[in-house]
């Protein structure tokens, strides 16, 4: 592909990936010190690819789908150990790469590097934390400032503003970070969302990244997050029927087993950060979709061993 590695020499890109993977079998999760120029070049090259590809990605199975990572870099490496390091498998990540965990920079750098190296096999969606007003507060800004400078945080923000927001797998599985929206009646509405863009406080883009399913509501309800809506199983069934789809696949909420079904298996939540924040005893999961659109789950068990950061 012409856009493959645009702006980064393939040998330089491979060197960055090799350094990021250097500690993949170590018992301790170490910091990987890339230069500011290297991180900047990852942001610039990947941004070009994101804008070259549609806002609603149209993908084919087989593919592995991962939920929130939140800077838990050691767990991201464990996911790849389980699922196969790219290009062994195709991947779709559902957003929330940064904040809360200690290694947001390593996490986003490896994901962007794989996006540049394998643009047609490796896909990243935007989560609600890929937004300046959120990651300014929950850790990513502080990590950028501590390890580099505020300018690098702004470079990442420019990149995040170009991420696609949804993916459709074989016309049957719709994937996004948050959930459905009362403003979503036609998939062209997703395709036509402008980029680059910040995330607004309401409307379709906001809902795709912020809404949550709820067993307590029918239709649309208030969301405790103070942003967007909750939606009942009736809205999931209605949406799938109208669009001749089988499944909504989303992330955005910690679930004990790493995955959780809703609405008679018409929606699944995937969360891929085990022992989230060191405060939860949740597992992490990755969903494998095979050629026949059969879904199975690979589980990262919560580990008793707290990683030591060097």
Curated annotation (Swiss-Prot):
Binding annotation for Mn(2+) 2: 96, 128, 177, 252
PROSITE patterns according to UniProt: SER_THR_PHOSPHATASE
Gene Ontology, cellular component aspect: cytoplasm; nucleus
Catalytic reaction list: O-phospho-L-seryl-[protein] + H2O = L-seryl-[protein] + phosphate; O-phospho-L-threonyl-[protein] + H2O = L-threonyl-[protein] + phosphate
Cofactor(s) in the UniProt record: Mn(2+)
Keyword Heme included in the entry's annotation: no
Its EC number(s): 3.1.3.16
Cofactor comment text: Binds 2 manganese ions per subunit.
Residues binding Mn(2+) 1: 68, 70, 96
Keywords, alphabetical: Hydrolase, Manganese, Metal-binding, Protein phosphatase
Keyword field contains Manganese: yes
List of catalytic residues: 129 (proton donor)
Leader sequence residues: none
SMART domains reported in the protein's UniProt record: PP2Ac
A molecular function (GO) term: protein serine/threonine phosphatase activity
Pfam families: Metallophos (PF00149), STPPase_N (PF16891)
UniProt record similarity statement: Belongs to the PPP phosphatase family. PP-1 subfamily.
This protein's name: Serine/threonine-protein phosphatase PP1 isozyme 2
Organism of derivation: Nicotiana tabacum
Lineage, broadest ranks: Eukaryota, Viridiplantae, Streptophyta, Embryophyta, Tracheophyta
Gene label: NPP2
